[in-house]
């Protein structure tokens, strides 16, 4: 390895005034782009550079104008068994297109879900009946599952479902799915923007649209948090109890982070907390290192979601472990805010145990001001939970992005990007890197040892320019993955398809054709691209869902299908933040 400077000067790029900071050691990278081969990313002996993507077609659905798209990464799946993949594209309506761009099915806006579809839809056979299901969440507390039957979509029996709670019918902004209890059926977790006193933000549904209730559990498992006391209740857990507040941006992941065989539901909140729920709805206990400092509940244990996370590890040690010194003050120290911070689950250090990865914005001052985005890796509760919710060794000092330009109160559009952590091996040994688009205008790659490996400034000096979640795929069959993402802003022709090498070098920066005005929401690509071989010819298509002009499809000549470690939003069509580095 060879040291390489990063930052605005070294990269000759425009970025925010503050520089990013590394974690455990100096910023390093692999200048030759070397990456060890793994079973999930094999070479097809490709020997030519990545070819420039070729635009194929645009789709708008059942009308001449395009509905507004949000963060719902398209789903690419063979619905009818013909060897070609269809495109599931949620806007306000939900469209299904074939590989050639023809509209096959439409669920119109407000038919079953209200308003926009913000989060990526889950695409899976939920109940194992051989029929593909598509699950989408809307506003007004609505969630719907559809079945693909007889060449079209129909509402699945038992659906739509409701996420109404404590007098609010909020928007579903996050969705992830997985077989939580190992019975062969897939549960769907939905997180909402509920802010009511006593309101629940996390709902888990069975394939039949009913709230999930694991066998043998005597208390109502979901939704959470609840207002019950005693066994299975949240109101008096560890004495103090717990409550949540608003999940605003794809705030849910799923994965096994403890000693049993069941998967946990990982949720981040707008109250500076991150929680891990077991399948029965109860919370995972944090390590004994963390105890309550409040005089009323002094030395009581804490669950994952019962304490604010602070950026400085010494602050957390003094406050939650030693119980010494002044209580933390937001005016002088940064806390971690998880407002729109999707969690992913993966084995970062290669020890065979999963960690939780998130990129909260680190805030300070009153009113709160983001100082940067903190790449965070927390250990699970394996081995009896002795290090549960603690920082992975080497990650005590969190790698931090540059400071984004503050936005004025009420400046909502275009919306900030969602800092979803992509966890995949792009450099060096088989341990994964963390790649993410950050709202300081840069894409970051952070190594498993908490080193910032490289950054690429996608904004190039343009104000209020953001990027989608990236995807990681090999586009020239050499077994070395590329990074693919889109950009958006409010400016004319802000939408671009960008492709980087695994070392962060720009390969292509392509303005999208036929861009619109975005209706004041945004212009370009807010949702993660999706990449697959749509038409069965052995080469890959890149599918982009846009704010302003529908769905664009590009083909990449000379590409292959043997290395697609993170090909769609949140890693897979279950949208649960799992990739090849996840340990089942």
PLM regions with names:
Residues 1-36:
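Ser/Thr-rich, Pro/Gly/Ala-heavy low-complexity intrinsically disordered linkers and tails
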Residues 30-584:
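Extracytoplasmic/lumenal domain signature
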């Amino acid at each position: 390895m060879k040291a390489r400077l990063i930052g605005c000067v070294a990269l000759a790029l425009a970025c925010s005034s503050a520089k990013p900071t590394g974690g455990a050691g100096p910023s390093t990278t692999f200048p030759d782009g070397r990456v060890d081969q793994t079973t999930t990313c094999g070479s097809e002996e490709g020997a030519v550079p990545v070819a420039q993507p070729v635009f194929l077609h645009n789709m708008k659905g059942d009308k001449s104008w395009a509905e507004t798209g949000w963060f719902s990464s398209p789903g690419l799946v063979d619905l009818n068994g013909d060897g070609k993949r269809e495109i599931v594209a949620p806007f306000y309506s939900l469209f299904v297109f074939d590989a050639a761009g023809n509209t096959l099915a439409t669920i119109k806006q407000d038919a079953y879900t209200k308003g926009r579809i913000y989060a990526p839809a889950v695409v899976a056979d939920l109940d194992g009946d051989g029929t593909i299901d598509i699950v989408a969440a809307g506003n007004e507390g609505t969630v719907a599952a559809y079945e693909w039957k007889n060449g079209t979509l129909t509402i699945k029996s038992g659906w739509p479902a409701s996420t109404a709670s404590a007098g609010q019918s909020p928007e579903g902004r996050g969705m992830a799915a997985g077989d939580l209890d190992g019975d062969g059926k897939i549960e769907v977790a939905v997180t909402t923007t509920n802010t009511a006193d006593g309101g629940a933000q996390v709902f888990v549904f069975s394939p039949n649209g009913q709230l999930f209730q694991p066998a043998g559990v005597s208390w109502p498992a979901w939704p959470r948090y609840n207002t019950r006391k005693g066994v299975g209740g949240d109101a008096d857990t560890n004495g103090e109890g717990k409550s949540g507040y608003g999940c605003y941006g794809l705030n849910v992941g799923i994965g096994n982070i403890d000693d049993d065989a069941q998967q946990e539901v990982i949720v981040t909140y707008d109250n500076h907390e991150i929680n891990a729920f077991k399948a029965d709805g109860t919370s995972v206990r944090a390590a004994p290192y963390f105890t309550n400092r409040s005089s009323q509940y002094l030395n009581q244990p804490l669950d994952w979601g019962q304490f604010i996370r602070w950026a400085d590890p010494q602050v957390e040690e003094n406050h939650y472990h030693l119980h010494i010194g002044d209580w933390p003050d937001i005016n002088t120290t940064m806390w971690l805010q998880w407002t729109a911070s999707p969690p992913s689950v993966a084995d970062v250090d290669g020890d065979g145990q999963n960690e939780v990865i998130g990129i909260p914005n680190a805030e300070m001052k009153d009113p709160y001001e983001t100082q940067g985005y903190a790449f965070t890796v927390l250990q699970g509760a394996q081995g009896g939970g002795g290090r549960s919710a603690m920082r992975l060794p080497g990650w005590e000092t969190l790698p931090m992005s540059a400071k984004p330009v503050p936005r004025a109160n009420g400046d909502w559009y275009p919306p900030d990007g969602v800092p979803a952590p992509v966890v995949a091996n792009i450099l060096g040994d088989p341990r994964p890197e963390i790649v993410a688009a950050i709202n300081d205008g840069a894409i970051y790659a952070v190594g498993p040892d908490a080193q910032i490996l490289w950054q690429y400034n996608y904004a190039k000096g343009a104000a209020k320019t953001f990027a989608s979640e990236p995807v990681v795929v090999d586009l020239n069959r050499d077994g070395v993955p590329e990074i693919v993402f889109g950009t958006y802003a409010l400016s004319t022709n802000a939408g671009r398809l960008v492709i980087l090498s695994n070392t962060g070098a720009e390969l292509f920066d392509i303005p999208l054709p036929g861009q619109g005005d975005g209706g004041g929401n945004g212009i370009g690509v807010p949702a993660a691209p999706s990449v697959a071989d749509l038409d069965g010819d052995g080469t890959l298509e890149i599918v982009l869902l846009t704010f302003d002009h529908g769905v664009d499809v590009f083909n990449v000549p000379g590409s292959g299908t043997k290395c697609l470690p993170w090909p769609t939003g949140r890693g897979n069509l279950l949208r649960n933040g799992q990739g090849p580095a996840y340990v089942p």
